A protein has these predicted regions:
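N-terminal alpha-helical interaction blocks
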Residues: 2-16
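Signature of the catalytic double-stranded beta-helix
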Residues: 13-74, 79-91
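Intrinsically disordered, low-complexity coil segments
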Residues: 50-57, 103-112, 173-175, 210
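A structural signal for short, well-ordered beta-strand segments and their strand-loop junctions
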Residues: 58-66, 95-99, 109-115, 158-160, ...
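Short, solvent-exposed loop/turn segments at secondary-structure junctions
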Residues: 67, 72-74, 86, 101-105, ...
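Catalytic core of non-heme Fe(II) oxygenases with the double-stranded beta-helix
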Residues: 76-151, 193
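Conserved double-stranded beta-helix
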Residues: 120-238
């Protein structure tokens, strides 16, 4: 669709010029908000994520997925070890990570995502907060306890906002990693989502295919709110 000749995403850096990678990433993220993609995602949530994750419906997912392209040619750009809580995600949501490139080999460690077990994550995150550690200090503290996620296309890692995760180091494999991550939350915990509120950052997933069809049959919002009058904007509410 974008005009690049590419058979293996692991070699994306050879097909896409460096100064165009951001444009590709931005377009892929935007495409995840298309109706076709959202419907496919919601079906995946109902059929796979909810039962596998033992989640209670209704659930909400974020509106735009995060598509990540981790190049081997930009050693200064990588994802530091962190928790979702540090990035403003509430305790009630969970993260999902899906690799689109195979990172199962030991030598893929620096281009895969790494994660720490939940008990150690809670312990070391609190230790870092109490001592107000810098990013470099946290990286050195967390690194010995990180485990490589060995997975490939079709795999999914579901984890909490308390898990410490990230790449933590430059990609030195000579191959690109492409992945997608997003968040899901059970509706009953809507007040525990931090600043990622339903209706804004997240939207509810219809619980059945019938409900999905009914929503799809509704008139578009553009037509619904078009009354021929000018829009009104409130610049201040006192």
């Amino acid at each position: 669709k974008m005009g690049y000749k590419l058979d293996d995403l692991s070699y994306l850096h050879e097909a896409v010029p460096l100064d165009e990678v951001f444009k590709v990433t931005k377009q892929l993220c935007a495409d995840t908000n298309s109706e076709e993609f959202k419907r496919m995602l919601r079906r995946f949530v109902r059929e796979v994520v909810v039962p596998k994750g033992k989640l209670r419906t209704p659930v909400a997912v974020q509106r735009f997925m995060n598509v990540r392209i981790m190049l081997p040619t930009t050693p200064d750009l990588f994802f530091p070890f962190h928790t979702g809580l540090l990035y403003g995600h509430g305790i009630a949501s969970r993260s999902l990570w899906m690799p689109f490139t195979d990172v199962t080999a030991d030598e893929d460690r620096t281009r895969s995502m790494q994660i720490m077990d939940i008990h150690k994550s809670r312990e070391l995150a609190q230790y870092a907060i109490d001592r107000e550690l810098s990013l470099d200090e946290m990286t050195e503290l967390f690194r010995p306890h990180m485990k490589q996620i060995k997975a490939g296309p079709g795999s999914l890692c579901l984890f909490s906002q308390q898990h410490i995760h990230g790449s933590g180091e430059p990609n030195t494999t000579g191959k690109t990693r492409v992945s997608m991550d997003w968040r899901i939350a059970e509706g009953i915990y809507g007040d525990l989502l931090g600043r990622k509120i339903p209706g804004g950052y997240m939207h509810l997933v219809p619980e059945t295919e019938e409900e999905e069809e009914a929503i799809a049959a509704r008139p578009s919002r553009d037509g619904l709110y078009n009354n021929g009058k000018q829009n009104m904007f409130y610049v201040a509410n006192n």
